[in-house]
Amino acid sequence: MGRRSRAAMLPTNIILLQNLVKRDPESYQEEFLQQYAHYESLRDIFMLNGLAGGDSAAATNGLDVGNGSSTMAGTNGTTMSTSTSQLIELVGFVSQVCSCFPRETANFPSELKQLLLEHHKSLPFELKEKILSCLTMLRNKDVITAEELIQSLFPLLVAYSSHGNSLGVNSHAKELRKIIYTNLISLLKSCNTNGKNQKLNKSTQAVCFNLLDQPDSQGIWATKLTRELWRRGIWDDSRTVEIMTQAALHQDVKIVMSGVMFFLDADREREENFEENSEDEDGFDLDALRHKMQVNKKTGRRGKKLENAIKTVKKKKKNGPGAPQGYLNFSAIHLLRDPQGFAEKLFKEHLSGKTKNKFDMEQKISLMQLLSRLIGTHKLIVLGIYTFFLKYLTPKQRDVTRIMSACAQACHDLVPPEVINVMVRKIADEFVSDGVANEVAAAGINTIREICSRAPLAIDEILLQDLVEYKGSKAKGVNMAAKSLIALYRDVAPEMLKKKDRGKNAAMEVQEAKKGGKDSKRPQFGADNSVQGIAGIELLAKWKKEHGEESENEDADANWEVDVDSEEDDVDGEWVTMDSDKEYDVDMEDSDDEKDNAKGKESDSDLELSDDDDEKEVKDEQEDADIDPEAAFREIASTRILTPADFAKLQELRNEESVAKIMGIHKQDKREELVDASTLTGPIKYKQSREERLQKVLEGREGRDKFGSRRGKRDNMRSTTNREKERRKNFVMSIHKRSVRGKQKMSLRDKQKVLRAHITKQKKKGY
């Protein structure tokens, strides 16, 4: 009887039939075919009804199929017919069990795609939502491929776009776009989890390129999808960057700004996303979970929890900071295939062309920042950008500090100095002059310093010396800005400063260069500044000459084993640890006479020098100071092979030189360093209101006791002891006591006993 009642319920209870079909498909094949035939009939009715007309009414109010069919309320407030709900239920049922009957449902996925793509205007929102979820389910069951699903989702995403489309104003268009966009991200993420699915990625990127080729604004979805996949580290190749390059050169303003902001902010967003994921995994404690498993009752659930925890820890170690990242950690700007062409097109089409007026000021500043970052990173030549900056370099300009930071980033040593000099002169005239505020002057000098740090020849001596005079300003920001400019040119070109501003070390270098007839340290435009040979090799040659280790007869074992017990180790400083996995070339032809020569010279160094020896020492110091790096490299490279000890000592000498240098401005690649607009104004301290000062006073009082007497304030409430009362008693009241008067009559012997007893008691105190 139970089986008969169950069989009677199957045609109406789809959920029960679905469960039974999954358990035993062969036994319930007839019931499945019955429901599948019902689905086909409803589908045909919907398709015919959609072709007949009533697109807008069907889209908003549902479709009443059949005569006298009742309606029911939809999930979003619209009326939905019974046949619509039946079709939704049957579509979900067939999608769940189609893998059990692959022959009977071979055309089911294509029918769903046809129904969705050709009749989406007439289908109710609930049915479209159900078909989208079913297509995603079919892809998860490997019934359809990921490429087929993407080909079904992208046309709908474009069709329901709100830009220039009547369907975009549909009440459910926003929900549909969100569903499609989320499904696309999840699909691409799952397909690229175990490894890069290059076939799927290239096909999806081709669709994005096709969207951006169209002149309308539908390509905004290509930029949104690309940026999100870049943030998650799913797409990280140059083809992805080319999509955003094409977007930045588009005709539509929204697409252009989407591409521009990708190059400005996408890398930072990706790093933040990676750090957030790392922080989520850092809060896990495996040892605590193992302890709980040992103490608590062992169950299957806790065992699975422990297994999942171990997998999480292994994944964390695999993807941790020490392991290679799952994506290429390259900036998007570095992956450009033609940065020079991209920069020229960006400037020509958006900043200097006929379409420049369609961007507002905020968008123009973003374009300036991107263009300047491209020029500074790749050392490009776009000469028109420097004259374009001139009309915006005024103190009254909105967001002028961001424009000034873009000016600094766009400068490098390959740009002709006369081109940048015009911009520097404009900044000096507008910002660094009499009558301007201290913050304006500080911003101007700091901007000039940032420009000159990238292109030292961009300023002439007269203007530099005028700006340096602001070092005596009473304003702290202006003072610090001028001193930073002095510190820069002390290291780069000290001869451009006045003698009083050069400093001791820089003045000595200039004087020695003049006496020795050497070339000026001032950089020359177009000169090759690439590193040749080994950096700091002259320091090693000087050190060997001082310590008498320039002889060709050296001990090979001593050179290889750096940490040896010798007198030189005590003189030269700490031991040097050598990496065992590195390979070094060692000169094996050295003899064993080095130690004897070194010991003999060390014994001579303890003797006092005569006047002749002093003169000789001064002469040697001058010769050491005049060591040419190229000559030292040629000499050492042609006479010996550097050993691990030599490389270790060379690194040590480099560190000593950097520490010993008083005005040590670190030389670094200024192209990669971004200029923060907030740092150009310098330290600004505005006058505080009474409420702000009072708040600062109250913050200082937190965590400390109130000032005043501690009398009567004890940690534990109690009365005073007799000893405390006797000690605090007024001396005039206790001067006549017998014990006090007896001290005056005490003999010397008794006083000594009391003193010794007191000392002994003090020593024993605390033990």
Curated annotation (Swiss-Prot):
Transmembrane segments: none annotated. It comes from Saccharomyces cerevisiae (strain ATCC 204508 / S288c) (Baker's yeast). One of its GO terms (biological process) is ribosomal large subunit export from nucleus. InterPro entries: ARM-type_fold, Sda1, SDA1_C, SDA1_MD, SDA1_N. SUPFAM superfamilies: ARM repeat. This is Protein SDA1. One of its GO terms (cellular component) is nucleolus. It is found in: Nucleus, Nucleolus. The lineage of its organism: Eukaryota, Fungi, Dikarya, Ascomycota, Saccharomycotina. The keyword Cell cycle applies. The modification Phosphoserine is found at S278. Belongs to the SDA1 family. Residues 730-746, 754-767 have a biased composition (Basic residues).
